[in-house]
Amino acid sequence: MSVEINKLNKSYGGPAVIDDLTTRFRSEAISVLLGPSGCGKTTTLRCIAGLEHPNSGQILIQGMPVFCDRQRINLPPEKRDLGMVFQSYAIWPHMTVFENVALPLKARGLPPAEVTRRVDETLALVGLGAMRDRGATQLSGGQQQRVAIARCVASRPRLMLLDEPLSNLDAKLRAEMRKELKDLQRLTNATMVFVTHDQEEAMSLADTIFLFRDGRIVQEGAPADIYRKPVNHYVAGFLGKANIFPGVIDITGKAMEVRTADGQFVLARGAALPGESARSASCLVRPEYWCAHGDGGRGLPGTIESLMFLGDRTEFIVTTPIGPQTVTLPGYRAEKPGDSLRLSTELTQMHLFAPGT
């Protein structure tokens, strides 16, 4: 079930929180709204849910308008056939797991036998079948989150909206819940719109990421596409760690040279891009795309300033003529601060965009 937004605007008397937003969230996919606090992502979600009243624009769910200022349409939340999972879980502490999940079904007037069937089926789906009669206060944080998700799923909504539902969990539990949410989406073919400020969460969950800034979408696309080919400095810096440096790029044959005020260096080798010649650009190299070599030979000279061993990888800060570079290499490394090395990469691993963007 798709969601379409056309020229949506929302403000609270000051600067626009949502600024002329137009986009579409695909049916039977996970769309993640990503961005810092105050960028408009949660307000967008609440407008879709009917919990906020936009100033103007249009929202369609499966082609049917649920909000349109010109036609004076503004369906209440209960008429939009959607479910929502909040950051706070909103679990009733005096009820059992079964009673919490059954509450919205009873409110809709479903027969008791149907309520029982749906609740038991949904609890089995989220792995809580053995806890149906346990009190809500006896559950862990992850179990409470699964109850909130089960309560949403039990109503068989056409659309699931999730507002930072994993932010209160520890790192290990967040990773487990991300997998469970992806599995749940595949099993139910639900359309999910998920809000987060956590870039790792967005990358692992999303079919499509919508990166927000100041009430607008700066870039949208598959996680790998946005990570590898950001449109500007903001996107590059927000989604992962980024080494960005200016230079004049000269591609001749199969080598890329970067000329800077501090010298000229061969950084990358590979097939030259069609039509490329010398031009000014901002260069992006992700930390894991740098290759490190012993001192001597060609490449960008550098000195290790500091390093951190992170278990599966070692992260270095390397001082170079084009500024400090973050370098990530797999596993444990024997290098130490003060060691000299050379850095290079492949043309396919370097992304260029216009200066000042």
Segments from the language model and where they lie:
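Helix-to-loop junction immediately C-terminal to a conserved catalytic motif
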Residues: 49
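Conserved coupling/switch loops of ABC nucleotide-binding domains, chiefly the family-specific signature
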Residues: 55-58, 214, 246
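Conserved ABC transporter NBD signature motif
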Residues: 57-69
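Glycine/charge-rich catalytic "coupling/switch" loops of P-loop NTPases
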Residues: 228, 255-308, 332-357
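ABC ATPase nucleotide-binding domains
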Residues: 81-83, 87, 91-234
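Pre-Walker A (P-loop) beta-loop-beta motif of ABC nucleotide-binding domains
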Residues: 21-32
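The feature captures the beta-strand-to-loop junction immediately N-terminal to the Walker
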Residues: 34-36
